[in-house]
């Protein structure tokens, strides 16, 4: 990957001038001037997904200039570098190959002179065999009963991805009940343990090193709880499995290393649901559906790596995001799925985007003088409409939004889905076109009211519009289409990081707090007053000690 400051390119300078021409142009004007706008600014993927980006403050000239930026920063070279196994995570000297985990073509992918695909396929086969034994009831707990509940213990990528996918694919789930524990707050594990039976529960401990503080604290608490009933430590092997690479620590915990599922340094945590970390997904929806999830992602990988940039969906969405973040000053993006099963999707890509591109140092080690990753947030529709859409419609901040919905619901209950989708379509129309003062006044006349007598209310009912959105309409949310959608967002994030000259696949920002917590933890072991920190931290610790005494 080349290290090119995007602001030093001629394309960036051209975009700055273009912004000066575009900043006062409205979406309404763009539609009024082009009856073919939807056709020009939308695209489909495999007849499974329609991406409509026409309700954005862009023209064909805007996209051409953004594509020039991608060319000048050598995005094409960056894509080739990732897919070929080059160590593009330079701060950790690692390749970035989550695409290998879903490489259904089995084309060799080489890291350090070695094809990784045989190992990937071997772990998949091992997961298949294990999951089939659990799901079928062939695997028995220590009292001879089949497993009924699975508790995934992890944090970050070892939790957010599997939790999001198992929720999104709940219509495909089997008889096993899934639980997810992540927070080191004892309340999280305590509440889950109240719901399960030690005789019929399987714990998955997801930690590559088997040293992650939160995960191992929860795992040891789960083990202690289990042994209070089971008694004999040899029974741990029937109720615990590990998603890890530390065989020694796994064995010492009491887990049979035959039930340890490995993954590799070239798998980043927030891109790991495709790996052994996805075992909870397999146990929830079955191996065949997991393969469909992989296949959908692989199809998007092929689209991303082979489709010209002008028609490449992840690239188009990434470029539009850069346009708003760096030229319009938009600091956030909202992800708004109109599907209740997708209620964790925004939270998942909150980590995916903010941990990847929340960087202020470029690939040369210099502080940047431009915007990098946006703040990501969102909730399912229509809940959000009754919570934060007010600010999106009439606030002072630009919030570009992605609206996501399936055309076909898994629950065709009465006219629920038509009502849901009517809101999905209405919101992007309202955000784009708004409501003028003239329309508000005419509405009052139509009601037999005199607008002049309601002058004190009229301004508050005006919507400026011109709020940008993308609409992603899926035929249906299936394992395949979900895999493709997740990969679409992954590659959007990669594209933005590549163009913005930052390292997308490390996360040093999580380290400092961990280090300080490890220093503070021993200080909490007694009731002595602390004076080793700043006055604020000292004051907080000392009040905590006084109150707990």
Swiss-Prot record:
It is found in: Cytoplasm. It is an enzyme of class 5 (isomerase). GO terms for cellular component: cytosol. Keywords: Cytoplasm, Gluconeogenesis, Glycolysis, Isomerase. GO terms for biological process: gluconeogenesis; glucose 6-phosphate metabolic process; glycolytic process. Its main location: cytoplasm. It comes from the Bacteria. PANTHER family: GLUCOSE-6-PHOSPHATE ISOMERASE (PTHR11469:SF1). Catalyzes the reversible isomerization of glucose-6-phosphate to fructose-6-phosphate. NCBIfam families: PRK00179.1 (NF001211). This is Glucose-6-phosphate isomerase. It comes from Salmonella newport (strain SL254). The gene is pgi.
